[in-house]
Each structure stands twice: as C-alpha cells, then as structure tokens.
Amino acid sequence: LKSRLVLAEHYNSITLKDAELKVNNLPFTADGTIRHFPENRHTRIDMDMGLKISDMNDLLKFIPDAYFQNRDKIQAEGSILMEGSIHGFLGDSIVPNANLCCKIENGSYHIKDIKQGIDTLEMDLDIHLNGPFPDSSFVSLEQLTMKGLNTSLDMQAKVTNLFKNPAVRAGMKGKVDFTRLGQEFLNPDTLLVEGVMDADLSTTFTVNDLVESRFGKIHSSGKLNIDKLKAFSQSLGMDIFISDAI
C-alpha cells in the first residue's frame, strides 16, 4: 500500500489520497475516507477505487502463467476500465452500498504471426450491491460481443435477487467454438474446454429452479444447439459435460 495518509479526530478518521494497493496482485488506486464512530461502533466508508491499468496487453501480465499457452506470443489490444465505489455505514446488520463498473472497448486477442484470433471483444458490466436494501442489488451485463476463431457472439443478461434466489434474465445470439478458443489460448492442463454452441435464445429462470431441475419453471424462447460441451479444471473445481442439447 502506497498512499498519502491523513489521520484526524483522535485517529478515528483515516483519509487515503492517491493510494496504490494490490488486490490479487492487480494494482488499484483508492481515494476516500474511513471514519469510525465509537459511540455506536459504526464505521462510515466513502471510498472510490479504480484499476490502475488501462491497456488490455498490460492486464495479461497479471494473469497466472498456468492459464495460458504461448503466453509470450499473445498480443492483446484495447482499453479496459474498472471503477468502483463504497459509500455508507458498516456495523451490526449494516452494510454500505458498493458499485463496480467494468468495460472493455476495441479489444482484440491474437497470437503473434498468426492472423486469426479474437478480432472483436467488447464488454460492459455493472454491479450494484445495495447495503440498506439488498433486494435491490443486481448484476447487469449490458453487452458482451466477441468475434473471431469461428465464434460470433452477442449477449446481454441481468441478475437480480442476488442474496436469496438469484433470478436471471438473459439473451444470446451467435456461435461459440469452445474447442477452437481453447486450443489457441488456454493451457489444457489448467482449463480444458471443448464443444460448439449455437444460440438465438432468450431465457428467464431462478438459480433454485435450475439446481432443483424444475425445468417447467425455466422459460426460454428461440434455439439452443450444443454439440458436446466439456469444461474441466481440477484447480477451479469445474467438471461440466453436456451432450447433444437441442
């Protein structure tokens, strides 16, 4: 942690100015104040944070080597914006509001000296956690667009009721060749993905209905074709296999 630190009110108030800190080795900036109220043991947090990196190629340096193959040949382009804030009181049964915005613009992803790759990558993701009114919290994927390597996908989604029984509303259109993507970029010893998915689908469901196999309560319209989908990672605890889903 590097910062200009201001202590006040008998050390009950801490102000960070131009702070630099690392979260899972990712460099972030932080500005704001944390104030403690001894009379009721509450803490007021007013903090704004942002990812210090703005270039996609620089971001790749912070992702563990185990997830890539041909890492030294990977070339990424585009800008990334990640900004967040925490505002409100923290105490017994009191949680502040938290917001996070993440955007990728004009993104692309290629292997050096190979023309084919991810030619287009765009994402706009918003997360809002409402401390006083948790039922109003949500995750909104405003846009995910990916094109290249036999893949062309557009997707939007929103998840509400996050803390009880998350409700998902999503739409996707396009084709994803997981086999090709995995072969080009991922280390199969860490994460193995195979299969092809073709979709033009809108769907709404809750996580409980999906987990409990209450498929009659899952509402979908459009088409979804999966010619074998496999995703396996021992380190991530992932083992998924879907075959001939139409």
Please place each PLM-identified region on the residue numbering.
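Membrane-proximal interfacial segments on either side of biological membranes
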Residues: 1-4, 8-15, 26-142, 151-246
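Conserved N-terminal beta-sheet scaffold of ABC transporter nucleotide-binding domains
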Residues: 18
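Short aromatic-centered micro-motifs
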Residues: 21, 109, 146
